[in-house]
Amino acid sequence: MDNQKEEILQKIEEAEYVLVGLGQEFDMEFFLQSREDYRRIREQLQQQNVLWLLPYVEAQFRKQYMPEMEAEIEKGLQKLAKVLEKKSYFVVSSSMNHKLAEVPWKKMLLKKERFVAPCGDWTKKQCPDGCEEGIQTVTEADEEQLQESFKKLQTNGFSVPDLGKCPKCGKKLVLNNVYAGRYDEKGYLKTWTEYQNWLQNTLNHKMVLLEIGEGNRFPTIIRSPFERIALFQQK
């Protein structure tokens, strides 16, 4: 294991560009699925057509039942960010675990964000119909609503949190993630464009691809693009 770690660090040191993919395993769904209460709540969210609440529900389960594991993962990612800070790098994630976004993914001196999560999470809210004015940051009052809703779910109850209304159409806002009926992708598009521009600059340069914890839930975000990038880099 130590030899493998040293080999990876050496490859990163020698590379001009580093692309990191953080996958769905950071949601810890495998461990969550072992809990009957999690499976019950997830099924209830599906039945009520409010699966957009799932990223918040999963965050609460991790906080309650897996705090040590999540803290260890966060510590490891902070170390990775420190290793990468002198490199030209980008991190793309298919996970909806907001803890990944809280890691200081910034390039030294430039202090520019180097992280994009196209699936969203629970920290922004949107109009269910995708109105332009809909995307907003979740407030402390919203978090209280989310917490109240989660507590009811834990006791076999149910309520949809009141996250406010869309200023344009008046419909109740939902969390901005891929489980929203009409996912408003404007929440991440600016950083995604920066990521695509960064990728264009990597052609014909020495590059390392580091894929961690990815599965097949959303293969178009990490798995398939990484395979294509690796193929182009070999040519």
Residue ranges and their predicted role:
Residues 1-235:
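Conserved catalytic alpha/beta core of Sir2/sirtuin-type deacylases, generalized to analogous enzyme cores
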